[in-house]
Amino acid sequence: MPVFTASFQCVTLFGQPASAADAQPLLQGQRPFLHLHARRRRPCGPMLISKSPPYPASEETREWEAEGQHEHTDELRETTTTMIDGIRTALRSIGEGEISISAYDTSLVALLKRLDGGDGPQFPSTIDWIVQNQLPDGSWGDASFFMMGDRIMSTLACVVALKSWNIHTDKCERGLLFIQENMWRLAHEEEDWMLVGFEIALPSLLDMAKDLDLDIPYDEPALKAIYAERERKLAKIPRDVLHAMPTTLLHSLEGMVDLDWEKLLKLRCLDGSFHCSPASTATAFQQTGDQKCFEYLDGIVKKFNGGVPCIYPLDVYERLWAVDRLTRLGISRHFTSEIEDCLDYIFRNWTPDGLAHTKNCPVKDIDDTAMGFRLLRLYGYQVDPCVLKKFEKDGKFFCLHGESNPSSVTPMYNTYRASQLKFPGDDGVLGRAEVFCRSFLQDRRGSNRMKDKWAIAKDIPGEVEYAMDYPWKASLPRIETRLYLDQYGGSGDVWIGKVLHRMTLFCNDLYLKAAKADFSNFQKECRVELNGLRRWYLRSNLERFGGTDPQTTLMTSYFLASANIFEPNRAAERLGWARVALLADAVSSHFRRIGGPKNLTSNLEELISLVPFDDAYSGSLREAWKQWLMAWTAKESSQESIEGDTAILLVRAIEIFGGRHVLTGQRPDLWEYSQLEQLTSSICRKLYRRVLAQENGKSTEKVEEIDQQLDLEMQELTRRVLQGCSAINRLTRETFLHVVKSFCYVAYCSPETIDNHIDKVIFQDVI
């Protein structure tokens, strides 16, 4: 591991630190990047340190503490490893989707009569499931989240099934009592959480209940409103379209009448289902006796041991959301091969029309498509953004064709995240999607209408807030993860379909516990490293060479490094970044205080000796410092150009400490590498210019002009990093992106925000 030390005590080049009287006034625009907000920044270090666990000053105490913490950390890591292994096992056995059972769909399958003409159900195991899963209050439905629509639908369906076979009268009576006592509550249901096809399916169930003479309050005002809505929606359904092409209407055939089944059978999915709905497929089989429908139903009844889900399969959806959750929870690095398998599967099933929840469903949606596009592009696959045009109409974007309420929070949120991954030359649809989705989400956020029609998650408003406030170019991995640990609901997250359901592979407490343990390990390492960095800083006596707020610079330098490069085995790169940033700041501060570099060329070796590197990388490090220091002597040198040079210095230092750096003249990929350096330098210079334009009260048009230039260069850098030259190590390409995103983050965030993030990421324990 490369290690370096610095000692300024005996360096005559710097002389004595300038006194306040001797210091020359700073020219406008001559502040280092980390101090762009310095005049408004409150002290960061002491405030944060006081909130963190105490860091003993003496070596004896420190060693004693380190030993005890080491034992605790080893135990935590062992626990984390066990959980990671459990997740890995689940990912390796991923199939067509893990989903909870739907009492509603199971009941409709239970109504199917024996094919041989005998008495009783064709699938008796469905009856067994119904009998075994009645809840204590007499209802059926999701046991952990009470939604009246879900309970009424599920309970009524189960009662109809049991009554149809004249069995388990006691359970029927308890279910009926629940319905009688609670039907009125439907009028008070949350509109944003309406079950899919509820107003079509419930009246159909009620008609079946009437035929069975079930004692239900059919005249309840809430039901009259639902019947009226059913008639309104059925009147809007174009029957020619319904029978001619696959649409989402195929998902709710059990609630429709006067259907031409001969035509509809041509619209089945390849697996024999109607839009992957067991209830809809059961109705189709009841009406037609179609063998493929039977094979689909028989397969899922056996797979789920009697019960059936509300939708199946979900092979695409499950893989996408699992990768997304693991990435945002910060533990994706443990599952590189499993994630590669998932995304290879997605890429194989990618179509010009987009994606659906399963590979064989012809009805695509923007949610799966946007998530797929984003993840595939992030992981280096080549996908065309023109696919989003399939979900664009009249300047708006919708989730599914024919939706009565075309826009909901989570599909637009996922599309907004995807739209930010632009490459030069991409179709303008990404830009239009970004504008529309941002406006939509801003409107929902401003009016406090953040409930989603597809999911009931722990903190959707928090997820949207982060995406809106921190664009991808300024979002740092550990910040996103720390906030998402508070937003992710684990097993508490519920999904809305025909009934409420759970996606157990990617919404579970094991993910959450593993991620929290992993992050806790990271925090402990950060505190130890930060403590050591502080001691190194004091021993090196860097503070006496100026800087607006040395403690803040130290804290921010380390935070930016650790927020990007957080893996335990990359401590050398993390600390190398932080130390080089601190040294560069000290040198920059000194030069500004004495009016610029004097006799720099003749004393260059003496200045470089401030950072003696006694290892195999010393030559590369010395060359990197030499080039940075020489930039100060250039006639066209300005603080803006120095910022770009500092970004390159950081990149080179990180690469050197990661053991990946090759001297520029020896690189076989010289042109591609130089392009990455040029883009990095240019973006960071423009970010500095943008901040100054804002602080100096320049016009909005001027700032927007800089933003447009930044966006174009950021698109090019993103393309070169995500899909660039294979001769350049992926980690090397990502280093450029890490440094640029850290500069973006500082430019776009207030000092108070940065302070809060430092506190949250490093010092606030994950509970």
Swiss-Prot record:
Gene Ontology biological process: defense response; gibberellin biosynthetic process
Binding-site list for Mg(2+)? D365, D367
Cell membrane among keywords: no
Q: Place the motif DXDD motif on the sequence.
A: 365-368
Q: Which Pfam families match?
A: Terpene_synth
Q: Where is the composition biased (Basic and acidic residues)?
A: 59-74
Cofactor(s) required, per the database record = Mg(2+)
Q: What class of enzyme is it?
A: isomerase
* InterPro entries, per database record: Isoprenoid_synthase_dom_sf, Terpene_synth_N, Terpene_synth_N_sf, Terpene_synthase-like, Terpenoid_cyclase/PrenylTrfase
Alphabetized UniProt keyword annotations: Isomerase, Magnesium, Metal-binding, Plant defense
Q: Name one GO molecular function term.
A: syn-copalyl diphosphate synthase activity
User: Is Magnesium one of the keywords UniProt gives this record?
Assistant: yes
For this chain, the annotated S-S bridges are none
Enzyme Commission code:
5.5.1.14
Amino-acid positions noted as binding substrate in the UniProt annotation, renumbered to this chain? K233, K453
Q: Where is this region: Disordered?
A: 45-74
Conditions for induction: By UV irradiation.
Q: Which GO terms describe its cellular component?
A: chloroplast
Question: Which reaction does this enzyme catalyse, per its entry?
Answer: (2E,6E,10E)-geranylgeranyl diphosphate = 9alpha-copalyl diphosphate
Purpose: Catalyzes the conversion of geranylgeranyl diphosphate to the phytoalexin precursor syn-copalyl diphosphate.
- Additional free-text comment from the UniProt record: Phytoalexins are diterpenoid secondary metabolites involved in the defense mechanism of the plant and produced in response to attack (by a pathogen, elicitor or UV irradiation).
Q: Regarding domains, what does the record say?
A: The Asp-Xaa-Asp-Asp (DXDD) motif is important for the catalytic activity, presumably through binding to Mg(2+).
Protein name (database record): Syn-copalyl diphosphate synthase
Tell me the lineage of the source organism.
Eukaryota, Viridiplantae, Streptophyta, Embryophyta, Tracheophyta
